[in-house]
Protein backbone atom coordinates (compact mmCIF):
# COMPACT_ATOMS: atom_id res chain seq x y z
CA UNK A 1 0.00 0.00 0.00
CA UNK A 2 1.21 3.51 -0.78
CA UNK A 3 1.74 6.08 1.97
CA UNK A 4 -1.28 8.04 0.68
CA UNK A 5 -3.50 4.93 0.83
CA UNK A 6 -2.36 4.15 4.41
CA UNK A 7 -2.99 7.76 5.44
CA UNK A 8 -6.50 7.64 3.91
CA UNK A 9 -7.24 4.29 5.62
CA UNK A 10 -6.19 5.75 9.00
CA UNK A 11 -8.28 8.90 8.46
CA UNK A 12 -11.21 6.78 7.29
CA UNK A 13 -11.03 4.50 10.34
CA UNK A 14 -10.52 7.34 12.85
CA UNK A 15 -13.35 9.33 11.26
CA UNK A 16 -15.61 6.28 11.25
CA UNK A 17 -15.02 5.45 14.93
CA UNK A 18 -15.46 9.11 15.94
CA UNK A 19 -18.65 9.41 13.88
CA UNK A 20 -20.09 6.14 15.25
CA UNK A 21 -19.49 7.29 18.85
CA UNK A 22 -20.83 10.82 18.34
CA UNK A 23 -23.83 9.75 16.23
CA UNK A 24 -24.77 7.17 18.87
CA UNK A 25 -24.36 9.80 21.61
CA UNK A 26 -26.66 12.32 19.88
CA UNK A 27 -29.08 9.70 18.43
CA UNK A 28 -31.83 10.48 21.02
CA UNK A 29 -31.77 14.18 19.99
CA UNK A 30 -31.82 13.12 16.32
CA UNK A 31 -34.86 10.89 16.88
CA UNK A 32 -36.75 13.68 18.69
CA UNK A 33 -35.98 16.05 15.81
CA UNK A 34 -37.20 13.55 13.19
CA UNK A 35 -40.42 12.76 15.07
CA UNK A 36 -41.28 16.46 15.40
CA UNK A 37 -40.57 16.95 11.68
CA UNK A 38 -42.63 14.06 10.31
CA UNK A 39 -45.41 13.40 12.86
CA UNK A 40 -48.00 15.24 10.72
CA UNK A 41 -47.25 12.83 7.85
CA UNK A 42 -47.23 9.67 10.01
CA UNK A 43 -50.05 7.13 9.84
CA UNK A 44 -49.09 5.83 13.31
CA UNK A 45 -49.44 9.15 15.17
CA UNK A 46 -53.06 10.34 15.52
CA UNK A 47 -53.70 14.12 15.66
CA UNK A 48 -54.47 14.02 19.42
CA UNK A 49 -51.30 11.97 20.13
CA UNK A 50 -48.85 14.34 18.41
CA UNK A 51 -45.88 15.62 20.39
CA UNK A 52 -46.20 19.21 21.63
CA UNK A 53 -42.46 19.91 21.52
CA UNK A 54 -38.96 18.67 22.38
CA UNK A 55 -39.59 18.16 26.14
CA UNK A 56 -42.93 16.36 25.59
CA UNK A 57 -41.23 14.09 23.06
CA UNK A 58 -38.29 13.27 25.37
CA UNK A 59 -40.67 12.46 28.27
CA UNK A 60 -43.12 10.33 26.24
CA UNK A 61 -40.72 8.22 24.13
CA UNK A 62 -39.32 6.08 27.02
CA UNK A 63 -42.81 5.75 28.59
CA UNK A 64 -44.55 4.68 25.37
CA UNK A 65 -41.81 2.87 23.42
CA UNK A 66 -39.04 2.09 25.93
CA UNK A 67 -35.69 3.81 26.53
CA UNK A 68 -33.85 1.88 23.78
CA UNK A 69 -36.25 3.27 21.16
CA UNK A 70 -34.29 6.55 21.34
CA UNK A 71 -31.72 4.76 19.13
CA UNK A 72 -34.13 3.60 16.41
CA UNK A 73 -32.55 4.21 13.01
CA UNK A 74 -29.09 4.82 14.51
CA UNK A 75 -27.47 1.77 12.87
CA UNK A 76 -28.42 3.01 9.39
CA UNK A 77 -27.03 6.43 10.31
CA UNK A 78 -23.69 4.98 11.46
CA UNK A 79 -23.36 2.68 8.41
CA UNK A 80 -24.13 5.62 6.11
CA UNK A 81 -21.03 7.48 7.29
CA UNK A 82 -18.51 5.09 5.71
CA UNK A 83 -19.68 5.14 2.06
CA UNK A 84 -20.39 8.89 2.33
CA UNK A 85 -16.83 9.64 3.45
CA UNK A 86 -15.28 7.30 0.88
CA UNK A 87 -17.37 8.81 -1.94
CA UNK A 88 -16.71 12.37 -0.81
CA UNK A 89 -12.99 11.62 -0.79
CA UNK A 90 -13.19 10.06 -4.25
CA UNK A 91 -15.21 12.86 -5.87
CA UNK A 92 -14.15 15.95 -3.92
CA UNK A 93 -10.90 16.68 -5.76
CA UNK A 94 -12.38 15.82 -9.15
CA UNK A 95 -15.22 18.32 -8.76
CA UNK A 96 -12.89 20.97 -7.32
CA UNK A 97 -10.73 20.57 -10.42
CA UNK A 98 -13.76 20.99 -12.70
CA UNK A 99 -15.35 23.97 -10.92
CA UNK A 100 -12.39 25.69 -9.26
CA UNK A 101 -9.49 25.03 -11.65
CA UNK A 102 -7.52 28.24 -12.20
CA UNK A 103 -9.81 30.37 -10.00
CA UNK A 104 -8.07 32.80 -7.63
CA UNK A 105 -9.81 32.98 -4.22
CA UNK A 106 -8.79 36.60 -3.61
CA UNK A 107 -9.23 38.26 -7.02
CA UNK A 108 -12.25 36.22 -8.20
CA UNK A 109 -14.18 35.80 -4.96
CA UNK A 110 -17.68 35.41 -6.45
CA UNK A 111 -16.46 32.91 -9.02
CA UNK A 112 -14.72 31.04 -6.22
CA UNK A 113 -17.92 31.21 -4.12
CA UNK A 114 -20.05 29.84 -7.00
CA UNK A 115 -17.46 27.16 -7.80
CA UNK A 116 -17.37 26.05 -4.18
CA UNK A 117 -21.16 25.74 -4.13
CA UNK A 118 -21.18 23.82 -7.41
CA UNK A 119 -18.39 21.42 -6.38
CA UNK A 120 -19.94 20.86 -2.93
CA UNK A 121 -23.40 20.35 -4.41
CA UNK A 122 -22.11 17.98 -7.10
CA UNK A 123 -20.03 15.94 -4.61
CA UNK A 124 -22.96 15.83 -2.17
CA UNK A 125 -25.45 14.80 -4.88
CA UNK A 126 -23.11 12.07 -6.17
CA UNK A 127 -22.64 10.65 -2.66
CA UNK A 128 -26.40 10.89 -2.02
CA UNK A 129 -27.12 8.73 -5.09
CA UNK A 130 -25.43 5.83 -3.32
CA UNK A 131 -26.33 6.40 0.35
CA UNK A 132 -29.84 7.92 0.09
CA UNK A 133 -31.65 4.59 0.77
CA UNK A 134 -29.80 4.38 4.12
CA UNK A 135 -30.89 7.92 5.01
CA UNK A 136 -34.42 7.00 3.93
CA UNK A 137 -34.42 3.87 6.14
CA UNK A 138 -33.01 5.84 9.07
CA UNK A 139 -35.89 8.34 8.81
CA UNK A 140 -38.59 5.68 8.51
CA UNK A 141 -37.20 3.63 11.42
CA UNK A 142 -36.93 6.74 13.63
CA UNK A 143 -40.52 7.68 12.73
CA UNK A 144 -41.79 4.19 13.66
CA UNK A 145 -43.51 4.70 17.04
CA UNK A 146 -44.84 1.15 17.53
CA UNK A 147 -43.94 -0.29 20.95
CA UNK A 148 -43.52 -4.00 20.14
CA UNK A 149 -42.93 -6.17 17.06
CA UNK A 150 -46.58 -6.37 16.00
CA UNK A 151 -47.17 -2.63 16.38
CA UNK A 152 -43.96 -1.71 14.55
CA UNK A 153 -44.11 -0.82 10.86
CA UNK A 154 -40.62 -2.26 10.22
CA UNK A 155 -38.58 -4.87 12.11
CA UNK A 156 -35.27 -3.23 11.22
CA UNK A 157 -33.06 -1.78 8.49
CA UNK A 158 -33.25 -4.73 6.06
CA UNK A 159 -37.00 -5.17 6.55
CA UNK A 160 -37.60 -1.47 5.82
CA UNK A 161 -35.59 -1.51 2.57
CA UNK A 162 -37.20 -4.78 1.37
CA UNK A 163 -40.80 -3.72 2.17
CA UNK A 164 -40.53 -0.31 0.46
CA UNK A 165 -38.78 -1.80 -2.60
CA UNK A 166 -41.57 -4.41 -2.93
CA UNK A 167 -44.26 -1.76 -2.55
CA UNK A 168 -42.85 1.19 -4.56
CA UNK A 169 -39.76 -0.14 -6.33
CA UNK A 170 -36.32 1.50 -6.08
CA UNK A 171 -37.99 4.89 -6.69
CA UNK A 172 -39.66 4.60 -3.27
CA UNK A 173 -36.25 4.65 -1.57
CA UNK A 174 -35.42 7.97 -3.28
CA UNK A 175 -38.47 10.04 -2.27
CA UNK A 176 -37.35 13.62 -1.58
CA UNK A 177 -34.00 13.22 -3.38
CA UNK A 178 -34.22 16.42 -5.47
CA UNK A 179 -35.08 18.62 -2.47
CA UNK A 180 -32.17 17.00 -0.59
CA UNK A 181 -29.73 18.21 -3.25
CA UNK A 182 -31.26 21.71 -3.09
CA UNK A 183 -30.83 21.61 0.69
CA UNK A 184 -27.13 20.70 0.36
CA UNK A 185 -26.52 23.69 -1.94
CA UNK A 186 -28.45 26.08 0.38
CA UNK A 187 -26.54 24.73 3.41
CA UNK A 188 -23.19 25.20 1.68
CA UNK A 189 -24.13 28.71 0.51
CA UNK A 190 -25.08 29.72 4.07
CA UNK A 191 -22.08 27.98 5.64
CA UNK A 192 -19.54 29.31 3.16
CA UNK A 193 -21.00 32.83 3.13
CA UNK A 194 -21.26 33.24 6.91
CA UNK A 195 -17.92 31.53 7.64
CA UNK A 196 -15.96 33.67 5.17
CA UNK A 197 -17.66 36.85 6.40
CA UNK A 198 -16.95 36.00 10.06
CA UNK A 199 -13.31 35.14 9.35
CA UNK A 200 -12.88 38.32 7.31
CA UNK A 201 -13.98 40.42 10.30
CA UNK A 202 -11.22 39.04 12.55
CA UNK A 203 -8.07 41.17 12.97
CA UNK A 204 -5.72 38.20 12.38
CA UNK A 205 -7.65 35.25 10.87
CA UNK A 206 -4.62 32.92 10.68
CA UNK A 207 -3.73 33.24 14.38
CA UNK A 208 -7.20 33.02 15.88
CA UNK A 209 -7.54 31.46 19.34
CA UNK A 210 -9.02 27.94 19.25
CA UNK A 211 -12.00 28.98 21.43
CA UNK A 212 -12.88 31.80 19.01
CA UNK A 213 -12.55 29.41 16.03
CA UNK A 214 -14.80 26.88 17.79
CA UNK A 215 -17.42 29.56 18.55
CA UNK A 216 -17.38 30.72 14.91
CA UNK A 217 -17.73 27.11 13.70
CA UNK A 218 -20.66 26.54 16.10
CA UNK A 219 -22.43 29.73 14.99
CA UNK A 220 -21.86 29.06 11.29
CA UNK A 221 -23.09 25.44 11.57
CA UNK A 222 -26.19 26.57 13.51
CA UNK A 223 -27.04 29.37 11.03
CA UNK A 224 -26.49 27.14 7.97
CA UNK A 225 -28.54 24.37 9.60
CA UNK A 226 -31.50 26.68 10.33
CA UNK A 227 -31.43 28.29 6.85
CA UNK A 228 -31.50 24.90 5.09
CA UNK A 229 -33.85 23.25 7.65
CA UNK A 230 -37.12 23.72 5.68
CA UNK A 231 -35.60 21.66 2.83
CA UNK A 232 -34.81 18.90 5.33
CA UNK A 233 -38.39 18.98 6.65
CA UNK A 234 -39.84 18.68 3.13
CA UNK A 235 -37.56 15.79 2.18
CA UNK A 236 -38.39 13.89 5.37
CA UNK A 237 -42.12 14.40 4.74
CA UNK A 238 -41.65 13.08 1.19
CA UNK A 239 -39.85 10.02 2.61
CA UNK A 240 -42.94 9.29 4.72
CA UNK A 241 -44.99 8.87 1.52
CA UNK A 242 -43.25 5.71 0.33
CA UNK A 243 -45.41 2.63 0.82
CA UNK A 244 -48.66 4.62 0.68
CA UNK A 245 -51.30 4.06 -1.96
CA UNK A 246 -54.31 5.98 -3.35
CA UNK A 247 -56.08 8.25 -0.87
CA UNK A 248 -53.29 7.69 1.69
CA UNK A 249 -50.85 9.75 -0.41
CA UNK A 250 -50.58 13.21 1.17
CA UNK A 251 -48.40 15.07 -1.35
CA UNK A 252 -48.37 14.77 -5.14
CA UNK A 253 -44.79 16.06 -5.27
CA UNK A 254 -42.21 18.32 -3.65
CA UNK A 255 -43.93 21.60 -4.65
CA UNK A 256 -47.26 20.29 -3.34
CA UNK A 257 -45.53 19.33 -0.08
CA UNK A 258 -44.14 22.88 0.40
CA UNK A 259 -47.57 24.35 -0.38
CA UNK A 260 -49.59 22.05 1.90
CA UNK A 261 -47.24 22.36 4.90
CA UNK A 262 -47.42 26.17 4.64
CA UNK A 263 -51.20 26.21 4.08
CA UNK A 264 -52.21 23.63 6.71
CA UNK A 265 -49.57 24.09 9.41
CA UNK A 266 -48.07 27.56 8.83
CA UNK A 267 -44.49 28.69 8.21
CA UNK A 268 -43.34 27.57 11.69
CA UNK A 269 -43.95 23.93 10.71
CA UNK A 270 -40.91 24.00 8.42
CA UNK A 271 -38.73 24.55 11.51
CA UNK A 272 -40.16 21.89 13.84
CA UNK A 273 -37.26 20.26 15.70
CA UNK A 274 -34.78 22.91 14.50
CA UNK A 275 -33.63 23.69 18.04
CA UNK A 276 -32.74 20.04 18.65
CA UNK A 277 -30.78 20.22 15.39
CA UNK A 278 -28.67 23.05 16.86
CA UNK A 279 -28.01 20.91 19.97
CA UNK A 280 -27.04 18.01 17.73
CA UNK A 281 -24.60 20.31 15.90
CA UNK A 282 -22.63 20.56 19.13
CA UNK A 283 -22.06 16.83 18.73
CA UNK A 284 -20.47 17.66 15.38
CA UNK A 285 -17.84 19.77 17.15
CA UNK A 286 -17.24 16.85 19.50
CA UNK A 287 -16.55 14.62 16.45
CA UNK A 288 -13.73 16.91 15.29
CA UNK A 289 -12.05 16.83 18.72
CA UNK A 290 -12.51 13.06 19.01
CA UNK A 291 -11.24 12.54 15.45
CA UNK A 292 -7.96 14.37 16.22
CA UNK A 293 -7.47 12.34 19.41
CA UNK A 294 -8.14 9.02 17.62
CA UNK A 295 -5.66 9.86 14.86
CA UNK A 296 -2.94 10.17 17.52
CA UNK A 297 -3.74 6.64 18.77
CA UNK A 298 -4.19 4.84 15.41
From Swiss-Prot:
Principal location class: mitochondrion
Post-translational modification: Trimethylated by ANTKMT at Lys-52.
UniProt cross-references to PROSITE patterns, sorted A to Z: SOLCAR
Regulation of catalytic or functional activity: The matrix-open state (m-state) is inhibited by the membrane-permeable bongkrekic acid (BKA). The cytoplasmic-open state (c-state) is inhibited by the membrane-impermeable toxic inhibitor carboxyatractyloside (CATR). Proton transporter activity is inhibited by ADP:ATP antiporter activity.
Transmembrane residue ranges: 8-37, 75-99, 110-130, 179-199, 211-231, 274-291
Mitochondrial intermembrane side: 1-7, 100-109, 200-210, 292-298
Family: Belongs to the mitochondrial carrier (TC 2.A.29) family.
PANTHER family per UniProt: ADP,ATP CARRIER PROTEIN 1-RELATED-RELATED, ADP_ATP TRANSLOCASE 3
Note: The gene coding for this protein is located in the pseudoautosomal region 1 (PAR1) of X and Y chromosomes and escapes X-inactivation.
Listed name of the protein: ADP/ATP translocase 3
